[in-house]
């Protein structure tokens, strides 16, 4: 292929094979390898493709560290392969990208920002007490983070029925759970099927294993704007009815017509406007710093993100107390 700017030509491996006016580049020789396109390192873990632009980096498995265990927990839901559901959607938020990184593993806001969604579930017959979940939040190292909680009042296609799903799916959902018990034992089966999980991979990937599995990546386009892409995901062995229930559950919360995404967009943009005030010097993430056990509604997982962000910027840990999150 040929660069439309100056006409340099490359083969499919990125090697430079054509150079107009070669004589002017005699100091560099004729089509030297160093003038070819830079090879980007990439690796795959459990069908997730990761790329890394830095010149030096650890192996993918080393970088993921403890986060691998939770990717496994998500992918082990089925013996079939995880697959992307055709479609997906893109949107932007007028807020700094780090606010979305925080939001992805923030369980504290659920009963407030998403109150209307919980009320909607109640109208379907969901027990209001089931919204009072128990769980934990974890900083997994390298900036990765997790919140995990249950019982999943919204239900889970694998494998926890709720009034959000058709009554006819009860037997197949129960059978999926029994198969998980056969494969992994009762304890791990319950971890897989009876808990909601939001896994953040530093710096810009969130895997939401909730009422409908979705994968979110995001990239800053300005200091006060972020571009977001969300894909739904499922498993290759699902029946048409199971896939329909998964998609319906997903879009009830995620996307422009869902209860959740518009709430989060409005809240984050409101936060961004507030952080523009010069007198606001920091954002408080001290919730849960005292207790030895980290609840999912505490903020250790958010502090883990900020520690890694600070480390990469070469800041001392004490400086975290002085950070303005809108920077």
Per-segment meaning from a language model:
Residues 1-69:
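Rieske [2Fe-2S] iron-sulfur-binding domain
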Residues 40-327:
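C-terminal catalytic domain of Rieske-type non-heme iron oxygenases
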């Amino acid at each position: 292929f040929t660069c439309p700017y100056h006409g340099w030509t490359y083969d499919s491996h990125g090697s430079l094979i054509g150079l107009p006016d070669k004589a002017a580049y005699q100091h560099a020789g004729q089509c030297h390898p160093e003038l070819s396109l830079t090879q980007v390192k990439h690796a795959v873990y459990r069908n997730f493709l990761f790329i890394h632009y830095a010149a030096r980096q650890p192996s993918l498995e080393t970088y993921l560290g403890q986060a691998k265990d939770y990717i496994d927990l998500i992918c082990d839901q089925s013996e079939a392969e995880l697959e992307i559901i055709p479609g997906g959607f893109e949107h932007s938020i007028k807020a700094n990208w780090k606010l979305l990184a925080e939001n992805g593993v923030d369980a504290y806001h659920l009963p407030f920002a998403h109150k209307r969604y919980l009320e909607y579930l109640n109208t379907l017959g969901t027990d209001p007490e089931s919204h009072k979940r128990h769980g934990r939040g974890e900083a997994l190292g390298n900036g990765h983070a997790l919140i995990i909680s249950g019982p999943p009042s919204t239900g889970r296609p694998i494998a926890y029925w709720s009034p959000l799903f058709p009554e006819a799916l009860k037997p197949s959902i129960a059978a999926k759970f029994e198969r998980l018990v056969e494969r992994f034992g009762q304890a791990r089966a319950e971890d897989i099927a009876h808990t909601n999980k939001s896994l953040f991979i530093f710096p810009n990937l969130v895997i939401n294993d909730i009422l409908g599995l979705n994968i979110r990546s995001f990239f800053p386009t300005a200091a006060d704007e972020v571009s977001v892409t969300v894909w739904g995901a499922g498993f290759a062995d699902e029946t048409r009815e199971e896939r329909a229930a998964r998609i319906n559950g997903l879009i009830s919360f995620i996307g422009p017509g869902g209860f959740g995404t518009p709430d989060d967009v409005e809240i984050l943009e409101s936060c961004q406007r507030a952080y523009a005030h010069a007198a606001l010097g920091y954002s408080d993430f001290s919730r849960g710093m005292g207790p030895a056990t980290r609840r999912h509604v505490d903020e250790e997982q958010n502090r883990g993100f900020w520690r890694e962000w600070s480390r990469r910027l070469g800041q001392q840990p004490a400086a975290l107390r002085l950070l303005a999150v809108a920077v």
